[in-house]
Amino acid sequence: MYERILVPTDGSDVAEAAVDHALDLAERYDAEVHALYVVDIDSVNFSLGTEQVDRLKQGRFDEMGELKERADEATGAVADRAGERAVDVVEHVSGGRPHKVIGDYAEEHGIDLIVMGSHGRAGVRRALLGSVTERTLRSTHVPVLVVDYLEED
């Protein structure tokens, strides 16, 4: 049923909840997991200089130590957990608008399922904040499994 499962990650608790589900499915269906870290170029434009933003747009993440370290840590955590279950994993880092990068990656790599986390927000708060998950759902033809993450009070 599933041969390739994409799990976008930023290393957050929300993303980690999705990783658990992605790995469970991969183990069950003997699927390969793709761990994708997306650098949101729109949000870093304001905090970085022009040269840094150009590096991001060109995908030259190796030249940006702290960013590369964060990305490797997030995708590496998925790879480590996958290794414990004998699940094959592909790690990838890309820059752009997250929902677009996720959708494009899924189509370019023949992904059968995208597994994403979402904060358990509702009502006006969700509408005002928007979400990468919601935008991804609206912009891709690949099935998306949304894993709700509710923070404990």
Q: What positions do the PLM features span?
A:
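Small/aliphatic-rich secondary-structure junction motif
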Residues: E3-V53
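Generic structural signal for helix capping and beta-alpha/helix-loop junctions
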Residues: D42-S43, H99-V101, G123
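A short acidic, glycine-rich active-site loop
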Residues: D54-E73
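Structural beta-alpha unit
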Residues: D80-I114, Y149-D153
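Short glycine/serine/threonine/alanine-rich loop segments
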Residues: A31-E32, V87, I111, V142
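Gly/Ser-rich helix-loop-strand patches that form or flank binding pockets
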Residues: Y105-D153
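Conserved beta-strand positions in the Rossmann-like core of class I SAM-dependent methyltransferases
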Residues: H34, V90, L145
